[in-house]
Amino acid sequence: STIKWLEGKGVKKNQMVLYGESLGTGIAVEVASKSKFAGVILESPFTSMQDMGKKLYPYLPISILQHDKYLSLNKIKKVKSPILIMHGQADNIVPFYMGKKLFDEANDPKVSYFPEEDNHMMEYNEELIKTLKNFLSSLSNL
């Protein structure tokens, strides 16, 4: 994995920032729930794969068909790293309420960036870049 490769190069986990986008946020939360990192950034995160399945296929028995390993809402409290959650309120793929719910459940220190107009793919405008820079500069081991 990338983490093991970086550790082989002498980089410690507390010097790494995990970044997950959309489906990748489930993996980032899973990994961050097991070890402390310098920080975690989640872009357009979902609460669980089952929640997403129920949203996309409301007519199917998703909880029976899908065994969910990526229960981000259940695991977010185990994340002990500083966290930045970014989610566009106009997201038409992963509902905004999922990112907001994860933010509400996350431990401090935490930062949010919830622009009204952004959809699933965030616009990397001046405000978002400023938020990222401020978050990264607040991390102690970078």
How would you describe each model-predicted region?
Residues K100-E123:
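Catalytic histidine neighborhood in serine/cysteine hydrolases
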